[in-house]
Amino acid sequence: MVRPADSSVDAQRAREQFLSAGALQPDAVAPSVLNSWQRSRELQVHPDRVDLPYLRDPDTDTPLMHAAAPVLRRIAEDLSDQAVSVVLTSADGLVLDRIAADTEFERILDDVRLARGYSYAEEFAGTNGIGTALETGQPAFIRGSEHYVGTLGGLACAGSPIREPVTRRILGVVDLTCWARQADPLLFVLAKSAGSQIEDRLRTMNNETETALLDAYLKQSRRYPGGVLAIGGDVVLMNRYLRQALDAADQTVLLDHAAELTRSSFTSTTVAQLPSGASVKISAAERIMVGVRGDSVVLHVSVHVAESIPVRGSQHIPRLAGRSSSFRRSAHQVERCYRDREWVVIEGEKGSGRTHLGYSVARFVTPEKTIPVLRIGDFETPESFVAAFDSETDDADFAVIVADVDELPDEVLHPLAAVMQTRAGRGWIAATTSAERDSQLVDMLMLPFFIHTVTVPALRHRIEDLHELVPMLLNELSRGEARMDAEAMRQLAKLPWPGNIAQLRHVLTETLRRQRSGVIGADKLPSECRSVTRRKLTRLEAMERDAIVRSLLENDGNKAEAAEALGMSRATIYRKIKDFGIA
């Protein structure tokens, strides 16, 4: 059944009235259409021309694409004698795929940018079957002049959201577009059916992946005598060895590190320090690939239980904040190495306080000694660095820290190793390094001299230590004149701290520029503290995030007013708030 001509005329009149008067009589158009027109006007979409940005090249290797491909092909074949296009988009309206048999109709779609890489979100294209379905979360059938943009008035589009079967999160939209004069309610029915078919395929693929993950887990459990861990989506499998060897706190930290390794396509092994003091080596044993690119992995976990070290709770090492069991154990391991004059590698993420830990422990045990810290960046030439090391280790009872040995240039390593060879068996050297170093020369020339390795936990893995770290750093930076209130401390505890203590010091320094004394509230924290995204932002993204946070603060949290002040649409600011994790 083709839509009657008079209803098309009514929609055209209603659109013209809305654009001129900004209001309509009740029932002039469907409420969903009117609401979308109002959103389009607020988003400042141009009503007379298509002005769409090319966002990015579509990613064709996703579960959504793999699930949708056969459904789209089948529908396109069934409609091959019709001027109908089958379109798949992402959750932000980006056109991922488009199939149309009619070449003339394809040219029309190219003219209105209904093509791969362009976005048909409402913020760009106004009212349409794709953007309106995404905005409302419901199927949408937009015909002729119901489109907000006049250029699209010759088309009709039926869009149906596609949801992830478990979480029900919207993954994208399947859309059928045809000439407005040929619009048929059956097109809407077909679009909704296509959406359901794609969701069914996603559900089947999830089940296949979970089955494959279970099979791989059981296979690795039979072959590997140690810990076996499987992670995929919402599924976590842990063998009895790990459940018995690790308590709940250790298991939580293990899963955190394992999840990070699972998401990485470059790293296959990592080492982690657990709250109990045990360390684990986590290695990817098998990645599950069942027709899609996924993050399902079976891991081997080797557990190394630390020797029992008495933790003397009454002893406090000055300028060394942190009462978490993992950090205290690291400190006491370094202390034991220093007292026994055994060389030690202190490894951990950059900014985690590796050098500070070694220096503070050495000064605590021997306050009368000077503990030199050698950094290659403090010297004009590699030769002067090696000469300084030679001089500082010349006496029989020397103590020295070499910072960031994994960053030493190759021309330093050979002469430095030669000097170390002559110092073996006396004095004390601590060398700091990243746990994920990739320098084979460092492993070959440097590490054999060191008896022990102590891992300093990342700040995000000992977040409870903020209660000591923040007051200590504030006291140092403000001379005791400032402190954080409870709300500010709660906000700091939410952050992932990829830059560790170095980032915390920077944050507190920036905060004190806003308020130098007294009780500091969360509103005085810098912009990066309002963002809880785990990925590292580019410099441009960080500037954009800061501008949004400032505008939100200046407009008392009103997103619409903040967007207007920044000259961006409301939909854009909502999307960026979500992307940047602005709290």
Swiss-Prot record:
<keyword id="KW-0010">Activator</keyword>
<keyword id="KW-0238">DNA-binding</keyword>
<dbReference type="GO" id="GO:0005524">
    <property type="term" value="F:ATP binding"/>
</dbReference>
<dbReference type="GO" id="GO:0006355">
    <property type="term" value="P:regulation of DNA-templated transcription"/>
</dbReference>
<dbReference type="InterPro" id="IPR027417">
    <property type="entry name" value="P-loop_NTPase"/>
</dbReference>
<feature type="binding site">
    <location>
        <begin position="395"/>
        <end position="404"/>
    </location>
    <ligand>
        <name>ATP</name>
    </ligand>
</feature>
<keyword id="KW-0067">ATP-binding</keyword>
<dbReference type="Pfam" id="PF01590">
    <property type="entry name" value="GAF"/>
</dbReference>
<dbReference type="InterPro" id="IPR002197">
    <property type="entry name" value="HTH_Fis"/>
</dbReference>
<keyword id="KW-0805">Transcription regulation</keyword>
<dbReference type="InterPro" id="IPR002078">
    <property type="entry name" value="Sigma_54_int"/>
</dbReference>
<dbReference type="InterPro" id="IPR003018">
    <property type="entry name" value="GAF"/>
</dbReference>
<dbReference type="InterPro" id="IPR029016">
    <property type="entry name" value="GAF-like_dom_sf"/>
</dbReference>
<protein>
    <recommendedName>
        <fullName>Propane 2-monooxygenase operon transcriptional activator MimR</fullName>
    </recommendedName>
</protein>
<comment type="function">
    <text>Acts as a transcriptional activator of the mimABCD operon encoding the propane 2-monooxygenase complex.</text>
</comment>
<keyword id="KW-0804">Transcription</keyword>
<feature type="domain" description="Sigma-54 factor interaction">
    <location>
        <begin position="320"/>
        <end position="513"/>
    </location>
</feature>
<dbReference type="Pfam" id="PF02954">
    <property type="entry name" value="HTH_8"/>
</dbReference>
<dbReference type="InterPro" id="IPR009057">
    <property type="entry name" value="Homeodomain-like_sf"/>
</dbReference>
<keyword id="KW-0547">Nucleotide-binding</keyword>
<dbReference type="GO" id="GO:0043565">
    <property type="term" value="F:sequence-specific DNA binding"/>
</dbReference>
<feature type="binding site">
    <location>
        <begin position="348"/>
        <end position="355"/>
    </location>
    <ligand>
        <name>ATP</name>
    </ligand>
</feature>
